[in-house]
Amino acid sequence: MLCIDCQTGYHAPYDRFERLAANPHAPSFLMRCRLCAALWNENSGVPELLTRTHARWLYPAARI
């Protein structure tokens, strides 16, 4: 279940996120909300809410 902040998107306060991994082939990072454990793909475009399956595919070395 997403927290209220994640329900409205990836936005400040950003200190609620922790970086789990970086994609060496693209400028993107796997971020996890400290409140609800939602996974986000932070990149140069619009951050994307990820399923665990999609996150494992994008970041195979990450501990999710």
Language-model region placement:
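Short recognition patches in nucleic-acid-associated and regulatory proteins
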Residues: M1-P24
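Short beta-strand element of the conserved SAM-dependent methyltransferase core
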Residues: R16, M31-C33, A61
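Cys/His-coordinated zinc-binding microdomains
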Residues: Q7, R34-A37
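Residue-level signal for mature regions of secreted extracellular proteins and peptides
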Residues: A26-F29
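Short, intrinsically disordered terminal segments enriched in charged and Pro/Gly residues
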Residues: R19-N23, N43-I64
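Short, non-ligating residues that shape and space the ligands of small metal-coordination modules
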Residues: A12-D15, L39-N43
